[in-house]
């Protein structure tokens, strides 16, 4: 976790938007919701909004300002997502920055062969185990969309693997109300009781909205289910600039915020005070391919601006970093991750996801996750800033050693070396001859070596036997349900 900006005045200070700019964009989003409206494809959500004064035309709902403002007012400024081990409890609040992977990659880089293949069972477990070992990864998502299970149960199998392979908090997704309830029951099995899970939720629910201005049926149903059960949630999205919004950052931010506030309003009307974060990635359209460019500087800029808007409203925020257009872990991947991680930390985003994404979120890579962990470690050191006081200036020691002297043998100075100096675990600092003597290892080879050490030696804390059995039973019953559905 990184403390950023106002929470740590010693850290570098950074903002994209001024307070007046935030206010103008916020009021534009409110006006958009009132004049243009938002598609709401969940009947219960539409009825809820209508009962509270929204107007409706088919699936398009127009929200009064006061309704949205009340939703912002009732949303908690912070909440906690727990892991199986309380040491990893994650305070989700602005300027408390936590990093983790992303979900639903179609392809996965096989750690044994280094080749891209379809994601399959076991990949989320590998991801969770690596996250469990990496010191700068705070929570777990699966980096995979299983190709070899019943499609409706892909998120359920993923969550089961994650529970087994990490003690850190999990951010889970679901593709139906039934799969959400399967995941919820698994979490109860680990927590021990429904009341214990409500007190210390071991997962948060993640979903997305469609751009522009569209809230789909099942994500809204799951958001409402999560709120009823005290499970924190995140709703993330954002237009591809130039395709799903006009070609300006301001219009993209307006559409992002309007959509996010639409989802927030539904949740807060349903269960006032439900813990929820909004999230945004208004990414630039690549002018040659029309794909969203995750690694573009504009995506990082817009993400940081979206965090400024969340701070202006007092809402927890999910951003994006460690996601590249590169197809392998190469120089491009490193450049794009470094910019994203640094701007995410400076912006104070509460949760930062998609660490380990390659090829526009199509490939999950554990080696890239390891590289991002290194970059996050570097960024943490920058964000700690420079402590300035009489004890750190050490003028008395400077006077004692005098002009031309050295400080290496001064115990008072040397005792601070571990605190002041960041030491890499992958990046190379050896002189050329020593690097050559050690085998002339490239950065990609060093990342692979560290990854294989983790997979070969790290053993997460095991699940209790009764929890394992309950999870197996939930999977079996879910499969039986899906068979009946297909037969029926």
Regions found by a protein language model. Name each.
Residues 10-14, 289-294, 322-329, 356-368:
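Short beta-alpha connecting loops at secondary-structure transitions
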Residues 44-114:
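Glycine-rich, N-terminal phosphate-binding loop and its surrounding beta-alpha-beta segment
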Residues 39-46, 57-60, 138, 197-199, ...:
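Flexible, glycine/charged-enriched surface loops at secondary-structure junctions
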Residues 282, 302-325, 350-357, 364-365, ...:
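A glycine- and small/hydrophobic-rich beta-loop-beta segment
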């Amino acid at each position: 976790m990184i403390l950023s900006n106002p929470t740590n005045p010693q850290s570098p200070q950074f903002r994209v938007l001024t307070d007046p700019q935030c206010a103008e964009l916020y009021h534009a989003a409110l006006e958009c919701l009132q004049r243009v409206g938002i598609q709401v494809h969940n009947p219960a959500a539409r009825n809820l909004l209508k009962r509270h004064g929204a107007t409706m035309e088919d699936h398009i709902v127009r929200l009064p300002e006061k309704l949205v403002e009340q939703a912002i007012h009732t949303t908690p400024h912070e909440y906690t997502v727990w892991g199986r081990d309380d040491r990893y409890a994650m305070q989700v609040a602005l300027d408390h920055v936590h990093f983790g992977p992303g979900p639903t990659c179609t392809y996965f880089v096989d750690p044994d062969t280094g080749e891209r293949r379809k994601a399959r069972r076991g990949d989320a477990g590998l991801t969770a185990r690596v996250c469990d070992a990496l010191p700068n990864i705070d929570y777990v998502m699966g980096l995979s969309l299983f190709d070899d299970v019943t499609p409706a149960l892909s998120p359920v199998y993923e969550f089961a693997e994650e529970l087994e392979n990490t003690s850190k908090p999990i951010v889970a997704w679901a593709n139906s109300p039934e799969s959400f309830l399967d995941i919820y029951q698994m979490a109860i099995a680990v927590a021990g009781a429904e009341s214990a899970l409500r007190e210390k939720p071991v997962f948060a629910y993640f979903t997305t909205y469609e751009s522009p201005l569209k809230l789909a049926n099942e994500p809204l149903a799951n958001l409402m289910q999560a709120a009823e059960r005290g499970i924190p949630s995140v709703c993330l999205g954002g237009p591809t600039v130039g395709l799903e919004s006009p070609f300006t950052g301001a219009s993209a931010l307006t559409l992002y915020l309007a959509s996010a506030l639409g989802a927030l309003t539904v949740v807060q009307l349903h269960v006032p005070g439900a813990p929820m974060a909004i999230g945004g990635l208004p990414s630039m359209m690549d002018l040659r391919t029309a794909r969203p460019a995750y690694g573009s500087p504009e995506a990082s800029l817009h993400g940081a601006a979206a965090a400024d808007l969340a701070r202006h409203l007092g809402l927890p925020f999910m951003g994006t970093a460690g996601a590249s257009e590169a197809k392998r872990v190469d120089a491009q991947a490193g450049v794009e991750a470094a910019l994203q991680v640094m701007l995410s930390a400076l912006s104070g985003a509460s949760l930062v996801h998609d660490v380990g994404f390659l090829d526009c979120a199509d490939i999950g890579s554990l080696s890239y996750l390891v590289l991002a962990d290194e970059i996050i470690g570097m960024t943490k050191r920058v964000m700690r800033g420079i402590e300035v006081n009489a004890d750190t200036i050490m003028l008395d020691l400077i006077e004692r050693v005098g002009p031309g002297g050295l400080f290496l043998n001064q115990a008072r100075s040397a005792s601070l070396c571990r605190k002041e100096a960041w030491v890499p675990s992958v990046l190379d600092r050896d002189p050329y001859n020593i690097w050559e003597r050690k085998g002339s290892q490239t950065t990609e080879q060093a990342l692979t070596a560290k990854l294989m050490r983790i997979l070969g030696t790290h053993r997460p804390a095991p699940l209790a036997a009764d929890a394992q059995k309950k999870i197996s039973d939930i999977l079996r019953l879910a499969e039986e349900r899906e068979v009946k559905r297909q037969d029926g």
